[in-house]
Amino acid sequence: MLVNIGFGNIVSLSRIIAVVNPGSSPMKRMKDEARKRGKLIDATEGRKTRSIIITDSDHIILSALQVETILQRINEINRVEDGDL
């Protein structure tokens, strides 16, 4: 399944390890290290980064959506898969 992370950008749900807030120093360091390694994907369309998505391929994806919004979308997909709708 695919998750919309904003502005028409989508990520495979099975590849997501974590969705975290970008404000902490460790997350800023992780973002900088990913940029140096060529593993940073900026999906913010020039807007403020409001969440960081960590994938199993060691890519770091920046999103302009709040962590809670992405979580709601993931939960909605899981409900549909489980047949709860």
Swiss-Prot record:
InterPro entries cross-referenced by the UniProt entry: RemA-like
Family, per entry: Belongs to the RemA family.
Pfam family, one: RemA-like
HAMAP family: RemA
Transmembrane intervals: none
Taxonomy of the source species: Bacteria, Pseudomonadati, Nitrospirota, Thermodesulfovibrionia, Thermodesulfovibrionales
Superkingdom assignment: Bacteria
Protein's name in the database: Putative regulatory protein THEYE_A0405
PANTHER family: REGULATORY PROTEIN SSL2874-RELATED, REGULATORY PROTEIN TM_1690-RELATED
